[in-house]
């Protein structure tokens, strides 16, 4: 976060949490696979600088975490027109793809946010607004500033972002503050590349009691001191293990890098050119054979001696296993989230498909995600009613369907539905549901096929007319 943003908020009586921003920045460095100066940069015993290789396993962990909380569809309520409107607005704002990125960032840095804004709206002198296009702004943890938190609920917040406009850097700060009547007031301030506020671009808009922003946080309790309003960044607790994973990889890489076979050859066996250089049959042998004088051989009685460096694969594998088990526990999915089995590394998504003991952790995060989606949709509906003259039901129950393909075995699920349909053949609905799921049909299409008897469920083949 820019220093002038912090100073501006402090002048208005707010405190910016420096410690939280420091922790978030540290987690972001690991997530972005940046070189950590005090860890990855090393020196040899001769003082020659070198850099450790990096596996970028932090990104892998966060991506797998996000896979388990991916959304399949948002349900906008029983009103079909309202449902379609919400889906259209979310699609125009690329919500599903941006949510996928945000949930991954939440795993890494603990927090993400979104607020609703109006583009190209008409603002009257009294602050009233009409028209415009409803847009969603997606915010990363480093650009989110909680201002007022009550019972762990964020009541007031500010959001900062930097962009390039007309070749000039502009930083925008948007805050949402409650007035004495319990209604939100939005104030937008714009700063130039030097951190100077541009007064003519400042706008103040009177909103209502519906919160115009939503915050997505890690469902796990944040036990880090002085991080009120922020979610727990999982990478923060895993940094030590991530270092160990990189060290394991560098040991393996070092062994492989020095694993080329060497052959020490007595000079008595070599031919030499006119300059005294040994002649080898081809270029490859120059890398393999090393000519030494007879007195330099480890055993002078030997004319040829092979050196085959050892690759410590068993020791390295055990070290990797320990690190991956610790990393699994750090992310809350037991000790087998990542493991070597039959010579293969199993990812979190593969493991969760076989074992269901991670579902409790997952369900907590899904509940948090559903609240986030519900808050965004309510804000969209309120903006539409207030500024565009619609009459949507803001209190309509809004839910999200999550993609369970990562935590369920689809083939086993289909077999179970097929068995139910065969066992209870007197209940046509079971067969229709099976056909819908198996062949990705609508209920109308499945009913038609069932009525015409086009599918024999015993063989899953179409019957002949």
Residue ranges and their predicted role:
Residues 201-353, 357, 401-409:
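Extended, charged amphipathic alpha-helical segments
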Residues 447-465:
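Extended, compositionally biased alpha-helical segments that mediate assembly or anchoring
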Residues 1-148, 153-154, 462-465:
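Extended, helix-rich architectural segments
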Residues 113-232:
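Extended, regular secondary-structure scaffolds
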Residues 332-346, 375-396:
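Short acidic alpha-helical/loop segments enriched in Asp/Glu that coordinate divalent cations
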Residues 25-54, 295-330, 346-371, 397-434:
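Extended, non-catalytic structural segments that build the interaction scaffolds
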